[in-house]
């Protein structure tokens, strides 16, 4: 989603609060909870899961391994739930022609550097660069080349834009900023 006027362009960036991330975190939580329950029920000799008798799984080595997988899965799912609740990676890109300033803001992980805020002068922007890698894992990323700073990605690597969409986005931004487009 973006907003544009004659002098300002604001592009909102979606973070980790995506339906696919919530789905994976939920599936991982339920699966790891199941593994932990099976491992615990094999240790205690009780049936915590009614449709799965605990006598079929002995604690050593299957119960220990399932408990370990359950605990590891709970740690990974809690990490996913934390990134979803903190909305890591979300933010905005603001291009202000009137003041000649580009501001890039992203939310990070909690701590000293939670707010990532970059400011550049528009005259330092050399070009808008499109990087395309085709194959099994196709990747199309839009970069902004800054003089003396290198490239800054403007799209997420997992955004999976089509070639037409990335070209359209690059053309609109290059036209707004009055800079050339490079393709790699």
From Swiss-Prot:
GO cellular component: chloroplast thylakoid membrane; photosystem I
UniProt xrefs under Pfam families: Ycf4
Chief place where the protein resides: plastid
Signal peptide: none
Membrane topology field: Multi-pass membrane protein
GO BP terms in the entry: photosynthesis
Domain of life from the UniProt record: Eukaryota
UniProt keyword annotations, A-Z: Chloroplast, Membrane, Photosynthesis, Plastid, Thylakoid, Transmembrane, Transmembrane helix
Transmembrane segment boundaries: 22-42, 57-77
Compartments, record wording: Plastid, Chloroplast thylakoid membrane
Function: Seems to be required for the assembly of the photosystem I complex.
Stated family: Belongs to the Ycf4 family.
Descriptive protein name: Photosystem I assembly protein Ycf4
Organism name: Morus indica
